């Protein structure tokens, strides 16, 4: 029987080669030691420079990527990719650490609850913000732009007029503001309510339309530096309207309304503060009289402007005649003047 020694030698060589490879593979397989760890032959790792952490073992033969807590769908990886694999019963979490499977499930549940809670909180906050936009508190200090309030002024106060009187929300009305400086205009934003309007301009049934102080831009311009009798009439009305000819603030009924309400802050809003050098926009005095007020608002100054109680108003009174002075007696007495026109010594 003839045997081809060449083929035989080749077969023996192949057999020996595969046997050697098989033994090498068996030696490289990890052996399970204590729970949570693996005893690994680090021979291959020495060649690759890879060192596995706790609960991991080295793997260079898998085709798929291992499972992760947030991704259970295996994806194809590069063949023979060399990396560390989580031990049996462990899974890699979002921090790339191998944890027990039950810990992974708990972590996912907590994340779901956190996300749901966060979504609910965001939804509640958005709802709360929306409600604030339409709440009474958020619209009750809108400095008098609502149409219903404008209608109360006998149909002649429009948006432009309100802006002239009280300033726009962004306080850009300082230039043509007839009564206030920009600082005072800012004070009006959010604090002018219906009661204040009634005190300053009268109620709708008082027919203030004819003598309304600031209806048009032209009238507003008149106030700048030219306070005269005509301007005062525009502001305070004429005698036939029972305003005591040039009575600066009130009829008897209106004077009663002011008692206990008009304080220093209100006077500042109406007439301006002393440091504003009252000359240009002051509704009661000429420039000379305005100069008297700067820093010297006291009892003597008030007497010069409004007269003394003992009917000696005629000599020094800048706005009224003796007849008008008599009209004041019994309405504005010393006590009332203190309440209405009192200023702290400046």
Curated annotation (Swiss-Prot):
InterPro entries: Ser_inhib-like_sf (IPR036084), TIL_dom (IPR002919). The keyword Lyase does not apply. The keyword Signal applies. One of its GO terms (biological process) is symbiont-mediated suppression of host innate immune response. Keywords: Host-virus interaction, Inhibition of host innate immune response by virus, Signal, Viral immunoevasion. Residues 1-28 form the signal peptide. Residues 52-104 form the TIL domain. Disulfide bonds: none annotated. It comes from the Viruses. Belongs to the polydnaviridae EGF-like motif protein family. Counteracts the host humoral immune response by inhibiting the processing and the amidolytic activity of host PAP1 and PAP3. Thereby, melanization of host hemolymph, normally producing several reactive intermediates toxic for viruses, is deregulated and proper immune response cannot occur. Interacts with host PAP1, PAP3 and SPH2. This is Protease inhibitor Egf1.5b. It comes from Microplitis demolitor bracovirus (isolate Webb) (MdBV). The lineage of its organism: Viruses, Viruses incertae sedis, Polydnaviriformidae, Bracoviriform, Microplitis demolitor bracovirus. The gene is O5.
């Amino acid at each position: 029987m003839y045997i081809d020694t060449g083929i035989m030698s080749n077969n023996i060589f192949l057999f020996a080669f595969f046997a050697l490879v098989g033994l090498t593979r068996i030696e490289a397989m990890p052996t399970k030691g204590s729970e949570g760890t693996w005893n690994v032959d680090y021979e291959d790792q020495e060649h690759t420079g890879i060192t596995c952490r706790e609960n991991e073992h080295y793997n260079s033969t898998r085709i798929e990527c291992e499972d992760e807590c947030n991704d259970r769908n295996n994806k194809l990886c590069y063949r023979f990719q060399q990396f560390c694999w989580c031990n049996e019963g462990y899974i890699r979490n979002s921090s790339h650490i191998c944890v027990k499977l039950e810990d992974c499930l708990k972590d996912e549940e907590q994340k779901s609850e956190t996300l749901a809670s966060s979504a609910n909180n965001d939804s509640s906050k958005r709802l709360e913000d929306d409600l604030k936009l339409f709440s009474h508190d958020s619209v009750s200090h809108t400095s008098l732009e609502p149409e219903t309030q404008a209608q109360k002024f006998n149909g002649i106060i429009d948006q432009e007029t309100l802006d002239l009187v009280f300033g726009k929300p962004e306080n850009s009305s300082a230039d043509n503001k007839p009564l206030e400086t920009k600082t005072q205009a800012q004070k009006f934003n959010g604090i002018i309510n219906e009661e204040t309007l009634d005190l300053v301009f009268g109620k709708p049934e008082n027919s203030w339309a004819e003598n309304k102080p600031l209806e048009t831009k032209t009238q507003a311009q008149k106030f700048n530096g030219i306070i005269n009798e005509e301007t005062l009439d525009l502001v305070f009305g004429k005698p036939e309207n029972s305003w005591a000819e040039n009575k600066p603030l009130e009829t008897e009924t209106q004077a009663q309304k002011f008692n206990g309400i008009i304080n220093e802050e209100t006077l500042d809003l109406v007439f301006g503060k002393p440091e504003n050098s009252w000359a240009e926009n002051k509704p009661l005095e000429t420039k000379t009289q305005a100069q008297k007020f700067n820093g010297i608002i006291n009892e003597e100054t008030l007497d010069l402007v409004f007269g003394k109680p003992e009917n000696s108003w005629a000599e020094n009174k800048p706005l009224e005649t003796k007849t008008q002075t008599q009209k004041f007696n019994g309405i504005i007495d010393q006590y009332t003047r203190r309440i209405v026109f009192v200023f702290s010594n400046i």
